[in-house]
Amino acid sequence: MRFEELDHTADVGIRAYGATLEELFENAAAGMFSLIVDLETVKPRGEVEVRVTADDLEGLMVNWLQELLFLHETQRLVFCEFDVAIKGLDLTGRARGEAIDKRSHELRLAVKAVTYHRLKVDPEKGVAEVIFDI
């Protein structure tokens, strides 16, 4: 299992799993986009590169997901595949997907923001939890 949805009053969250830190970040991104759209309907037609940095792993997770959410909102993109490289607290990621097409993409939730509320990134246990404002 790559990720699962978490119940949270008034908001929504995901619990992501990964054997490596990079996989944890990739699966968190997939989990976030699964809240937005059915990932099975998204084709990897284009690719964007994302670079973020932070002071700690939790901040790195928020910055990574928030940057992807920014691209979703401003460029009307949805993503289905993610590759991440992390060195220290610098992340370089690639997200593959396509422009939103109302004929093939039924949008689910409007995720407004990535929050620090109950945020957890635990690479030793291979789990991360993220709550989103909707």
For each feature predicted by the language model, list its residue ranges:
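N-terminal intrinsically disordered, cationic/polar leader segments
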Residues: M1-I134
